[in-house]
Every structure is written in C-alpha cells, then in structure tokens.
C-alpha cells in the first residue's frame, strides 16, 4: 500500500464518536453552552424539559452531547443517561451563590455513581460575564474538587453567553478523550 492510499484512507476515516453528558442545575446555562458549541442562535432559550442532543465536530472527534434538564423533578432521571459516557461536563452558575451547596451535593452524588466511575469531568464555572460571579478557584475550593482522585478533572471559567472560555474547556475534553480512547 502506497503512501497516497494510506493518506486517502486516513482522510476518509470517520471521526471518532464521543458521548458527552452535560449536566447541572436548572438555569446553569447548559443549553446555552450547547448552542454556543454548535454555533446556533442563543437569543431564545427555554428550560429543557427532558433532553437535547447535538453532534459537534471538534479536533477529529464527533462529540455527541446529551444536554439533560436540571430541574429538581428531572434529576432522578439523569442516571438513565450514564451508560457509555466518555466525558461528564457539569455546568455551574457562578453567580448563583445561594445554590452552591445544592450544586455541590448533586456533583458529589454524580461522582459516586458506579456507571460514571473514572469518567473525566469538566466543570464549567459559567456566567463569568456577570459581576456577581464567583471565580473558578473559589468554586473549586468550595466544592473540594482537590479531593477528586479517581478521575481527571478540570474547572474552567466560562461565559456560555459570550463564548469566553468555552473552547478552552472543549480543548481539555478532546485531550482527555484521546488519552482515554487510546
């Protein structure tokens, strides 16, 4: 097989599929983040009843992102989506300090789930465009993220509204998917 045919084969190779679970409390900005990733209009977003799925191409991967509603009544159903998850993205509203304890509890429970064991987790500290937003370092400390030892994790400041920090987070996702998939 010549070099040219090898290159053709590589070029035609389909992108590797990655299953990403996008979770967080209601109003954290999950759907806005997903639409930002898909370069879609973010001016009219309503609370997610159930789930949204979008596929996004990034760095040779086809990222299949499952955005699951975060309302309290929907959260018990999150576990129905855990199977075969490659990466967990957890979104936090950095400006809603009254809910830090609640979001921390939900994240802690997710990290205890057997079907999510060893799954890398990216925590987006969202809404950094708001003056009242807590910095990612303060959130990381408050959630005791430094105690996570059984998986790769990253906290990333972002604004789903402006797009700032979103690509940095997705670069981390792609890097950790390639490490996991090898």
UniProtKB/Swiss-Prot annotation:
Q: Where is the lipid attached (N-myristoyl glycine)?
A: 2
Q: What is its main location?
A: Golgi
InterPro entries assigned: ARL2/3, P-loop_NTPase, Small_GTP-bd, Small_GTPase_ARF/SAR
Listed under GO cellular component are: centrosome; cilium; cytoplasm; cytoplasmic microtubule; Golgi apparatus; Golgi membrane; microtubule cytoskeleton; midbody
SMART domains, per the entry? ARF, RAB, SAR
Q: Which cysteines are joined by disulfide bonds?
A: none
What does the record list as GO biological process? cilium assembly; Golgi to plasma membrane transport; kidney development; mitotic cytokinesis; photoreceptor cell development; protein localization to ciliary membrane; protein transport; small GTPase-mediated signal transduction
**Pfam families to which the protein is assigned, alphabetical:** Arf (PF00025)
Q: What is the annotated localization of this protein?
A: Golgi apparatus membrane; Cytoplasm, Cytoskeleton, Spindle; Nucleus; Cytoplasm, Cytoskeleton, Microtubule organizing center, Centrosome
Q: Which residues bind Mg(2+)?
A: 31, 48
Task: Show the GO MF annotations.
Answer: GDP binding; GTP binding; GTPase activity; metal ion binding; microtubule binding
Function according to Swiss-Prot or TrEMBL? Small GTP-binding protein which cycles between an inactive GDP-bound and an active GTP-bound form, and the rate of cycling is regulated by guanine nucleotide exchange factors (GEF) and GTPase-activating proteins (GAP). Required for normal cytokinesis and cilia signaling. Requires assistance from GTPase-activating proteins (GAPs) like RP2 and PDE6D, in order to cycle between inactive GDP-bound and active GTP-bound forms. Required for targeting proteins to the cilium, including myristoylated NPHP3 and prenylated INPP5E.
* PANTHER family found in the cross-reference section: ADP-RIBOSYLATION FACTOR-LIKE PROTEIN 2-RELATED
Oligomer status and interactors: Found in a complex with ARL3, RP2 and UNC119 (or UNC119B); RP2 induces hydrolysis of GTP ARL3 in the complex, leading to the release of UNC119 (or UNC119B). Interacts with RP2; interaction is direct and stimulated with the activated GTP-bound form of ARL3. Interacts with SYS1. Interacts with ARL2BP; the GTP-bound form interacts with ARL2BP. Microtubule-associated protein. Does not interact with TBCC. Interacts with RP2. Interacts with PDE6D; the interaction occurs specifically with the GTP-bound form of ARL3.
Q: What is this protein called?
A: ADP-ribosylation factor-like protein 3
**Gene for this protein?**
ARL3
């Amino acid at each position: 097989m010549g070099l040219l045919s090898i290159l053709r084969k590589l070029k035609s190779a389909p992108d590797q599929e990655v299953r990403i679970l996008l979770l967080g409390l209601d109003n954290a900005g999950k759907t806005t983040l997903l639409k930002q990733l898909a370069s879609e209009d973010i001016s009219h977003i309503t609370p997610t009843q159930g789930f949204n799925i979008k596929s996004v191409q990034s760095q040779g991967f086809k990222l299949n992102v499952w955005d699951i509603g975060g309302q309290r009544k929907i959260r018990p159903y999150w576990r129905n989506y855990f199977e075969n998850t490659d990466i967990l993205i957890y979104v936090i509203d950095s400006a809603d300090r009254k809910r830090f304890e609640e979001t921390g509890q939900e994240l802690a429970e997710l990290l205890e789930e057997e079907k999510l064991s060893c799954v890398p987790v990216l925590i987006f500290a969202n809404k950094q465009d708001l003056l009242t937003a807590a910095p990612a370092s303060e959130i990381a400390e408050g959630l005791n993220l430094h105690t996570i030892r059984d998986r790769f994790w990253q906290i990333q400041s972002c604004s789903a509204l402006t797009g700032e920090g979103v690509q940095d987070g997705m670069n981390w996702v792609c890097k950790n998917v390639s490490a996991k998939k090898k």
